[in-house]
Amino acid sequence: MGYIPYVIENTDRGERSYDIYSRLLKDRIVLLSGEINDSVASSIVAQLLFLEAEDPEKDIGLYINSPGGVITSGLSIYDTMNFIRPDVSTICIGQAASMGAFLLSCGAKGKRFSLPHSRIMIHQPLGGAQGQASDIEIISNEILRLKGLMNSILAQNSGQSLEQIAKDTDRDFYMSAKEAKEYGLIDKVLQKNVK
């Protein structure tokens, strides 16, 4: 991840130093940045579970700037978002592509956002296989199963038909924030933080 900034907060007990991610977590903000893999997913899942334990009623903000990544890693985040009691608001900052766009669309209804110059891209799952023909067939069937699952969830989240999702995800399908709103992947394009 590289350099991690620290912030200093003054309290009645003196100064306290936090890494920026811990400080954001205090405000119930989780940052999903970069490629989604098992390590990143474990960190996101742990933060979501921690925030639920802290306050099961208060919303969590999941900020996404990701080119996508491993399907099963992303699905573990998706399942956790649905498992926990707080609503998870999703906010695209920069880009949400592939699994990043999928997770963006999975935020709580009415709470899926993007900043105005972000890019959102959906497509079909990528995969490859080698080995014996029977092994390749098994992997191919699993990729097709995951494609069907993800298309079904995207259709449900966006209001688009399954046929339209299948057509649009056949190749990389890029959208601006405004186009993603019209498509149904997000609910609003944010201009200013109104907190």
Swiss-Prot record:
SUPFAM superfamilies: ClpP/crotonase. The lineage of its organism: Bacteria, Pseudomonadati, Campylobacterota, Epsilonproteobacteria, Campylobacterales. InterPro entries: ClpP, ClpP/crotonase-like_dom_sf, ClpP/TepA, ClpP_His_AS, ClpP_Ser_AS. It comes from the Bacteria. GO terms for cellular component: cytoplasm; endopeptidase Clp complex. NCBIfam families: clpP (TIGR00493), PRK00277.1 (NF001368), PRK12553.1 (NF009205). This is ATP-dependent Clp protease proteolytic subunit. It comes from Helicobacter pylori (strain G27). Cleaves peptides in various proteins in a process that requires ATP hydrolysis. Has a chymotrypsin-like activity. Plays a major role in the degradation of misfolded proteins. GO terms for molecular function: ATP-dependent peptidase activity; ATPase binding; serine-type endopeptidase activity.
